[in-house]
Amino acid sequence: PLKLLGLTSAVAIIDQALPDREPAAEVWHGLLVLLDTITDYDEYIWLAAYIRWEIGFLGETGFKLGLDKCVVTGDVEDLSFVSPKSGCAVSDVAGEQYRDKLLPLPSFLTSKGFKAPKEFSEGLQLTEYFFKRHVFGVYNKPVPSPRQRLFERVEMLHAD
C-alpha cells in the first residue's frame, strides 16, 4: 500500500542520510507527526504532509528551502518556481524568461493551495532534486530505493 511505502521511504531517508547515533530530535518529532498523518488522513493530506516533511528534513540536514517569498522581487504572491541553485521561490513574472531552467513549485506549498494531484509528483521531484544535490550526491550515494518507488507509485496514481 502507498501509505506503507511513504513510511518506508521516510525511514530509508533518515537511515541513509543521517550519521549513526547522532541526535536528531527535530527529525524524530517530524517523523512522529508524519506517522500520525499517514495513519489518520487520506492520500491527499498525507502526501502533502510527506513532501513538507522532506522539505523540513532538507532544512535539518543543512539545506533549507526558501519557499515563502520570491528571491528576486520579494513578492509573496504568484510563486511558481524554485531556483535550483538557491532553493528559493521565484514568482511567475520574475521566472517567466527562465522557466526552462527553474523547478516547478507545486501550488499546495504556496498560498494558492492545492490544485491538482500531479502536484504531488512535482513536489517529490522538487525534493528529490535537492536530495541528490545536497544530501546523497555529496557522498556519491543514490536516493534510497524506497523513495524512488514512492515517486514511481505516485506518478502512476496521478498520471494525466
Where are the regions that the model predicts?
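Non-catalytic alpha-helical scaffolds and adjoining flexible linkers that form interface surfaces
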Residues: 1-160
